[in-house]
């Protein structure tokens, strides 16, 4: 079934965020055709009384005026140039971006407003915007994170059915790094019993190093209502031998105990501390100045 794209205007572009390292989020699209079985957004879709089951990702809202709205919001006297996170609730470089170019337009607005931002994506299409990312990074802090939980072919195909292959994401990491963009990798989510073996984790870290990633972080799967039901249904189809284990782990909680989580993420931390390349030296950025008006 092909996705339906709904072209709709938005009233606001920036969303205030609490309890996170960033103050604002920006999502040029709503919905995502990647349809990852573990996607945490399904939980929020269920809370909003929207489909969180297999129908999720079949209808994508395209915020056609998002760049214009963003320009107005960034132009307010009250704007403090706080960090904006792009892609917290949808992938900004899913296939629709190739046609509508809303993410690229938003990056240009952020660059023009000297506003720092970070991007989280599974989409290699981001390399198309290297020119804008370079311009923006000369004015403010810019970070791009690729989500690459595993390089295991079967795990990727069954849990991230609509995404680009992990190795193509690594190639995008290399191209961004070669262009001087601060790029890292998020191993999220790591799936207990499927992608948490030490050799699997180290494989990702070593590949990240070879591609030029300068940072890495890892999170273990968590399952809230809406996500839990869909994930377990998909697990029963693709990994039936794992269902009993996951039901025991997650039946009464969304997050695993800290000790279990640490036992999975600690090898990543140790490997990344010895394998990853150092961060680039901070660039010297010019102060923002008033642009001349063209009448």
Predicted segments with their positions:
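Conserved strand-turn element in the central/C-terminal portion of the radical SAM core barrel
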Residues: 151-155, 160-162, 175-197, 221-223
């Amino acid at each position: 079934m092909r996705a339906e794209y709904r072209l709709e205007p938005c009233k606001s572009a920036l969303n205030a965020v609490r309890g996170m390292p960033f103050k604002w989020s920006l999502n040029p699209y709503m919905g995502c055709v990647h349809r990852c079985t573990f996607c945490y957004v399904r939980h929020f879709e269920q809370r909003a009384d929207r489909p969180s089951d297999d129908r999720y990702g079949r209808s994508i809202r395209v915020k056609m005026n998002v760049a214009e709205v963003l320009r107005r919001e960034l132009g307010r006297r009250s704007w403090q140039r706080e960090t904006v996170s792009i892609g917290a609730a949808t992938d900004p470089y899913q296939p629709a971006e190739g046609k509508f170019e809303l993410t690229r337009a938003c990056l240009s607005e952020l660059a023009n407003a000297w506003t720092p931002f970070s991007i989280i994506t599974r989409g290699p299409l981001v390399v198309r915007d290297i020119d804008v990312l370079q311009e923006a990074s000369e004015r403010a802090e810019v970070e791009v994170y690729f989500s690459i939980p595993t390089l295991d072919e079967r795990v990727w195909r069954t849990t991230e059915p609509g995404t680009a292959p992990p190795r193509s994401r690594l190639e995008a990491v290399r191209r961004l790094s070669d262009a001087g963009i601060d790029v890292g990798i998020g191993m999220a989510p790591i799936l207990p019993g499927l992608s948490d073996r030490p050799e699997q984790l180290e494989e990702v870290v070593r590949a990240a190093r070879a591609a030029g990633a300068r940072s890495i972080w890892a999170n273990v799967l968590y399952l809230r209502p809406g996500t839990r039901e869909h994930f377990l249904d998909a697990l029963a189809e693709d990994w039936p031998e794992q269902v009993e284990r996951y039901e025991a782990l997650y039946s009464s909680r969304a997050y695993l105990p800290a000790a279990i989580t640490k036992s999975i993420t600690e090898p990543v931390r140790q490997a990344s501390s010895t394998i990853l390349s150092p961060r680039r030296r901070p660039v010297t950025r010019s102060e923002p100045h008033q642009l001349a008006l063209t009448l």
